[in-house]
Amino acid sequence: MKYCRNWHFMSFRSLFLTGNIAEEKFCYHTLPEKLDPYDYEAFKKSHTKFYVGCSNVETGKAEYLPITDMKEEIDRMRASASLPLVSKIVKTAGMKLLDGGCTDSIPVKAFAKMGYNKDVVVLTRHKGYRKEKEGISLTKLVYRKYPEFVKAVYRRPSVYNHTLDEIEKWEEEGKIFVIRPSVPLTIGRME
């Protein structure tokens, strides 16, 4: 909250000046290295496995990238938070990437395949919520060089809703633990 009013943190000004709604240098270097120092060494020494979900714009598939050194692999983190239409594509790990929510919004199946079987799923929407189809004309135009990504964005609502159906089933069966708001939230996507 300390920096949320700083235009470098997130603003349309940053989008127009840098091509990213969240200014890369400020958010991924100045903030964690100087203003609010992140303990990179503690992260590096931790034995906890840490993954970020990204969308490969060339294949239209989700990628789950491990991060073992946050300072050296910060572009993986940046890619996972680079929202389409308001962020530049991030080139890292030999791929062109954007936010993972475009291709796998709730990656419970991906982590089950990795062997994780005690999932805690944190949702930002109330029980019963389902995503409606969205217009993707602008996405088609902006990402016309990446047809597989456009197809993935088009499929996103139905894939997301199917995943929610499975989560509710697994929750009833006691296979996963879900944390979600009890009522619809009245905040916007960027708040």
What are these regions (language model features)?
Residues 1-191:
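Patatin-like phospholipase
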